[in-house]
Amino acid sequence: MAMAFCPKDQYWDSSRKSCVSCALTCSQRSQRTCTDFCKFINCRKEQGRYYDHLLGACVSCDSTCTQHPQQCAHFCEKRPRSQANLQPELGRPQAGEVEVRSDNSGRHQGSEHGPGLRLSSDQLTLYCTLGVCLCAIFCCFLVALASFLRRRGEPLPSQPAGPRGSQANSPHAHRPVTEACDEVTASPQPVETCSFCFPERSSPTQESAPRSLGIHGFAGTAAPQPCMRATVGGLGVLRASTGDARPAT
């Protein structure tokens, strides 16, 4: 006969080839089967204890009376109120001590972190000030650069604009050099006449002529003109080359 599945409170006996109750073997010291069941049976026999299947151990009901399971209901209900209230009262000072400790730790932490917060605010103020200074320096640099570029684009005041305009507007500005030379050569020549020259008595006289431009275009210079000498009745007469000489009287 094959081995059959037995319930939790029984085990399979190979000699009998049947399921046998574990209660018969729990009293034996050398029992190897039904260990969990035997622990459960023995825990139920003890008052104020219950068997926890998750832990696989016997747990006292005193530690779970506030949140006790159903197995400990009869024990926690019969428990004296003085003992039931004693544990919460003992626990309250501990909670108070924990609160005091937490408050003290919070104060200590606050005292420790207080200067850190102040230091961070000072650092923030310092960084803001430095940022404003850097912005001001950058703006000044941009203004200086703009003024430099503006001055660079303006013409240099080496030559005044007035003479340029007057030279450009003058009628002789665009005339070629040949025309100017023609004007110089075409200007009226000074006239010199010699009349009644008496070489044996006095030097010939020179009439005043208007000051005009010479050969080279300088004022006050007179171009010399050759005179032709003629004898009229024993008198020497000089004639100008221009043909404006007057005969002697």
Curated annotation (Swiss-Prot):
Disulfide bond positions: C6-C19, C22-C34, C26-C38, C43-C58, C61-C72, C65-C76
Subcellular location: Membrane
Source organism superkingdom: Eukaryota
Keywords: Adaptive immunity, Disulfide bond, Immunity, Membrane, Receptor, Repeat, Signal-anchor, Transmembrane, Transmembrane helix
Keyword Disulfide bond assigned: yes
One Gene Ontology CC term in the entry: external side of plasma membrane
Region span, Disordered: 86-116, 156-176
Chief location of this protein within or outside the cell: membrane
TNFR-Cys repeats: 5-38, 42-76
UniProt topology in membrane: Single-pass type III membrane protein
A GO biological process held by the record: hematopoietic progenitor cell differentiation
Positions in the Extracellular compartment: 1-128
TM regions (residue ranges): 129-149
Role according to the record: Receptor for TNFSF13/APRIL and TNFSF13B/TALL1/BAFF/BLYS that binds both ligands with similar high affinity. Mediates calcineurin-dependent activation of NF-AT, as well as activation of NF-kappa-B and AP-1. Involved in the stimulation of B- and T-cell function and the regulation of humoral immunity.
Protein name, entry field: Tumor necrosis factor receptor superfamily member 13B
Source organism (scientific name): Mus musculus (Mouse)
